[in-house]
Structures are given as C-alpha cells and as structure tokens.
C-alpha cells in the first residue's frame, strides 16, 4: 500500500558537496580547449525562473507545441500507464507538463519529480500537494543525469518515466543513449517512458527560438556567469560577454555560447582564465531529431518504440524498456 500525503525530499547533497562539484566542473570547463560549461548549472533559482519565462515566449515553440500534444493526447498516453504506478519525471522544473498527465491518469498513485534546483523543486512540490491532495509527492533533489536514488515508498510500484521539454537534445547522441540505458535500469523491467523530442525544421524557426526579441534567453545564458560569481567568488564582467546562439546544420543542433567581447582575464576558483576577443564558452547544445532517427536511438539503447504523437514541430515518444541495460 502506498503511503499518501506529504513527504520530505530525499537528502540533497550538502552545500559543501554541491559547491565542490560545481567548482570542479567550472575549473575543468574553463581550462579546456575550447572552453565549455555544463548546461545543468543553468538551473539555480534565478536560472530556473528565467527558463520558465523562456517557455512562455512567443518565439519559443517547443513548450507550446509539447503542451498542445499533451493536452490533445493525454488520455491516450495515460492508457499505457499500469494501475497504481509512480510517475518519475527527470528534470521536472515547474511540473507544468506533468500536471496534464496527472489530470488524465487516475492510475498514477505517486509522483517523483527529480531536479537539481532545490528551492524551485520544494516550492513546486508543495503546490502539487495542494492541487492533488490524494497524490503522494516525493521530490528528489538530485542530478537526474547521474543515478538518482528513488524514494523507498515507490520501490514496489510500477514506474512510468517522463522526460519532456526536448531536454534529451541537450545530450550528445552517445550521452542520450547512456541516459536512456540508465533510465531503463532505474525504471525497471516493463516500464514505459514518455520523451519530448524537438524535430528537425527550418533554421530560421530554430534561430528565433533561441534569440528572442526580449532577450530573456540571453539573460538565461549570462546568468551562468553570474552564478559563478555569486557562488564561487569569480569576477566575470557580464557586460563583457554576449549571448550567441546559432544552428549548426551539419550536426543538426542549436549551439549556445557566451562570447568575450574583448581580450580579458577572469579570476575563477583561484585560477586566472584568459579570453581572446571573440573567444567563446560553449554552454549548451540542443540536438534535433527526425522521428525515425530518435526511434533508432531509443531502440539501440534498450527501448522499444510504442507510439509517437507529433506535429511538424515536435514529437512525444512513448517507449517500453526491452531489457535491463
């Protein structure tokens, strides 16, 4: 029997553990050639709030298209969910999309949002408990790209995975395959997984989505440097860096960079990092797939495609795990 009601999140890493990992990743990324930073660090409280603004921008079609597909097809998607299951969301953010599924799937008894942003996750979990009083909500503060520990309360429940937002595209293809294999092990034999995937399309639509007129995406990108200043005591001059986003047609991905506007030196984690004028920090990729190419990736990663709901912009894939990988 599932225990209902409020539950605290699994113990998050201590602030020292979190800061040490952040510092190590920043040091490794800024001393690499070319320079890079992991996109998971976008999502502190300020970054998470900025991303929520991005999802409501007129240029940013992925959220709008995915929500429409979910609203139109939630009942069909939920028909694949086993009775008494737990819905596990990877990188939950505001859980806006999970709410669509929760409203359509009476078979879901527990919801486990996994997210790296502690404050944002706890606030959203509290609101979910108010909105769905008969649903057990177990937030897990963790990096979902690693191997998060699920709450003991869902250990014996069937599990449905949910990975919306085209976040799968932020991984290199081999990393996406690795994530899918780990998700299969976490969710267990016979589990199903819903994945949102951005489709290949005209470059101008892609460009506008990542270069909005209001400049919110630029603020989101630059907030990564602001976070490094706040948490690691660096001295980045945000006015000396610019947001650059473009479509790399050969690799079928959007690339986001922060470009230095001048020759400069920045002190980070006790190390002096030099930048040439025009040199960039590569902060994110967003790979685009055809329906067939994503299903081939899934099939090679231990999943069998069951269904796909799509328009000409976006696709939501339903997969079933085929083997323990």
PLM regions and their residue ranges:
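N-terminal auxiliary segments of SAM/dcSAM-dependent transferases
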Residues: 2-41, 48
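Class I SAM-dependent methyltransferase Rossmann-like catalytic core
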Residues: 34-81
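Conserved class I S-adenosyl-L-methionine
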Residues: 84-93
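Conserved SAM-binding loop of SAM-dependent methyltransferases across substrates and taxa
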Residues: 94-107
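Conserved SAM/SAH-binding beta-strand->alpha-helix loop
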Residues: 114-119
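A short glycine-rich, Lys/Arg-flanked "PGG" loop and its adjoining helix->strand segment in the class I
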Residues: 177-189
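Conserved beta-strand signature within the Rossmann-like core of class I S-adenosyl-L-methionine
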Residues: 186-200
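Substrate-binding/catalytic lobe of Class I Rossmann-like enzymes that use SAM or dcSAM, i.e.
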Residues: 205-287, 291, 295-301
């Amino acid at each position: 029997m599932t225990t209902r009601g409020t539950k605290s999140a699994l113990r998050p890493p201590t602030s020292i553990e979190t800061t040490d990992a952040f510092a190590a990743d920043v040091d490794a990324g800024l001393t690499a050639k070319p320079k890079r930073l992991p996109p998971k660090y976008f999502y502190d409280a300020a970054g998470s709030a900025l991303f929520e603004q991005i999802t409501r921008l007129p240029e940013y079609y992925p959220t709008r298209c995915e929500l429409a597909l979910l609203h139109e097809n939630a009942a069909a998607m939920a028909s694949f969910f086993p009775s008494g299951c737990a819905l596990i969301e990877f990188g939950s953010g505001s859980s806006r999309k999970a709410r669509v599924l929760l409203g359509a799937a009476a078979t879901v008894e527990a919801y486990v949002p996994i997210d790296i942003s502690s404050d944002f996750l706890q606030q959203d979990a509290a609101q979910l408990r108010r909105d769905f009083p008969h649903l057990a909500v177990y937030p897990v503060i963790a990096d979902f790209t690693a191997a998060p520990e699920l709450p003991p309360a869902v250990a014996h429940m069937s599990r449905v995975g949910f990975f919306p937002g085209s976040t799968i595209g932020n991984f290199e293809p081999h990393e996406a395959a690795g994530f899918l294999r780990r998700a299969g092990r976490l969710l267990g034999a016979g589990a199903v997984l819903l994945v949102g995937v951005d489709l290949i399309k005209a470059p101008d639509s892609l460009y506008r989505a990542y270069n909005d007129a209001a400049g919110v995406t630029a603020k989101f990108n630059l907030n990564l440097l602001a976070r490094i200043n706040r948490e690691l005591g660096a001295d980045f001059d945000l006015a000396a860096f610019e947001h650059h986003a473009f479509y790399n047609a050969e690799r079928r991905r959007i690339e986001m960079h922060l470009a230095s506007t001048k020759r400069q030196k920045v002190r980070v984690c006790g190390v002096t990092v030099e930048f040439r004028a025009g040199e960039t920090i590569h902060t994110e990729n967003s790979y685009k797939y055809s329906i067939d190419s994503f299903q081939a990736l899934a099939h090679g990663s231990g999943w069998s495609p069951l269904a796909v709901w799509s328009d000409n912009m976006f696709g939501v894939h339903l997969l079933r795990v085929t083997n323990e990988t």
